[in-house]
Amino acid sequence: MAKKVTAQVKLQIPAGKATPAPPVGTALGPQGVNIMDFCKAYNAKTSGKDQEGLIIPVVITIYSDRSFTFITKTPPVPVLIKRAVAIAKGSPEPHKTKVGKITQAQVEEIAKIKLPDLNCFDLDAAMRSVRGTARSMGVDVV
């Protein structure tokens, strides 16, 4: 018989840097989950040179016996764009002030990374979505 799901918690945590402090502790504490077990498992799964400094979304499923499973997603598109362009944040006035440029090759690479988590089925639609996000951040697509 399957375990009964009591809650599903969605968080965005830096890769390899989950700690019992907020936001992890405040989200999992009321559910009765062992926070340190989650932090150790998450940090073990997300630690690595390729994910260093990225924010990784995670969906934690909590069961009635206080056990849990979690699924990590791909980093948000704005985080990948900021990493590709090497900027700290997007433009406060995106259509007036541009903060950087991104190439079509970089857009395609980001779209390939995000394709499993996006609600589109082909690479062209994913690239259009990434280009739109870049434009709304004040990044020129060249």
Swiss-Prot record:
CDD domains: Ribosomal_L11 (cd00349)
InterPro entries named among the record's database cross-references: Ribosomal_uL11, Ribosomal_uL11_bac-typ, Ribosomal_uL11_C, Ribosomal_uL11_C_sf, Ribosomal_uL11_N, Ribosomal_uL11_N_sf
Post-translational modification: One or more lysine residues are methylated.
SMART domains tied to this protein: RL11 (SM00649)
Keywords, in A-Z order: Methylation, Ribonucleoprotein, Ribosomal protein, RNA-binding, rRNA-binding
Sample GO molecular function, one term: structural constituent of ribosome
UniProt record, GO biological process: translation
TM annotation in the entry: none
GO cellular component, as recorded: cytosolic large ribosomal subunit
Pfam families per UniProt: Ribosomal_L11, Ribosomal_L11_N
Subunit structure: Part of the ribosomal stalk of the 50S ribosomal subunit. Interacts with L10 and the large rRNA to form the base of the stalk. L10 forms an elongated spine to which L12 dimers bind in a sequential fashion forming a multimeric L10(L12)X complex.
Family: Belongs to the universal ribosomal protein uL11 family.
Its biological purpose: Forms part of the ribosomal stalk which helps the ribosome interact with GTP-bound translation factors.
Protein name: Large ribosomal subunit protein uL11
Species name: Solibacter usitatus (strain Ellin6076)
Lineage of the species this protein comes from: Bacteria, Pseudomonadati, Acidobacteriota, Terriglobia, Bryobacterales
